[in-house]
Swiss-Prot record:
This is Peptide YY-like. Pfam families: Hormone_3. The modification Tyrosine amide is found at residue 36. It comes from Atractosteus spatula (Alligator gar). Signal peptide: none annotated. Its main location: secreted. The lineage of its organism: Eukaryota, Metazoa, Chordata, Craniata, Vertebrata.
Amino acid sequence: YPPKPENPGEDAPPEELAKYYSALRHYINLITRQRY
């Protein structure tokens, strides 16, 4: 599996959070595509 994106934490700037969430969505897509 690809590495899970690092959670930037509660006090991270909004652009870091946005980057994290898009990376997380991409990560989940990769995993679910492999599983099914």
